[in-house]
């Protein structure tokens, strides 16, 4: 299960590296440090994000599960990062002028959280479907909290630029529901 968790973290880091690129958020910092494209160049950031995705699946290949369990785990994790349900879909929604906020949150963040809960269950030999809703709900809650932080925090408080959602016209809970919800 540690290998599955590490693979999901590699995918999460890849999504952050890609999200910070100039074609998306053009973030100067991440976690209080220069973003990868600012520190090393845009081409190297793109390749680094891609390499993290490959590394995640190479890491999963090290698991010594039975083939059925491995197949289910690969499907769950690849779905969380792909389209039409995963991180790729969530990133694509940011390019659209009108977006259903719940669908966007489920794709952008809920899919990865769901993969974490489901993959943990599958790796332990349990039924992953029983854990899907928990992951989706945690992901949506996290994304709403992140939307609030983007609107109400300072860069020093959260270690990354703020106000990006509003400046870029991105879907977010504040824009749709207001600060008081």
Where do the protein language model's features map onto the residues?
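All-alpha prenyltransferase/terpene-synthase fold signal
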Residues: 1-181
């Amino acid at each position: 299960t540690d290998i599955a968790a590490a693979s999901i973290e590699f995918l999460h880091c890849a999504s952050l590296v890609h999200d910070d690129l100039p074609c998306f958020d053009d973030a100067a910092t991440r976690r209080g440090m220069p973003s990868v494209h600012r520190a090393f160049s845009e081409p190297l950031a793109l390749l680094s994000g891609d390499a993290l995705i490959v590394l995640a699946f190479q890491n999963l290949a090290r698991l010594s599960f039975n083939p059925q369990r491995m197949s289910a785990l690969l499907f769950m994790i690849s779905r969380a990062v792909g389209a039409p349900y995963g991180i790729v879909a969530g990133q694509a929604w940011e390019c659209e002028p009108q977006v259903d906020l719940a669908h966007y949150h489920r794709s952008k963040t809920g899919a990865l959280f769901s993969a974490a809960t489901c993959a943990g269950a599958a790796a332990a030999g349990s039924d992953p479907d029983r854990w899907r809703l928990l992951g989706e709900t945690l992901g949506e809650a996290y994304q709403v909290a992140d939307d609030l932080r983007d609107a109400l925090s300072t860069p020093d408080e959260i270690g990354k630029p703020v106000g990006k959602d509003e400046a870029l016209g991105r879907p977010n809970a504040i824009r749709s529901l207001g600060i008081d919800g």
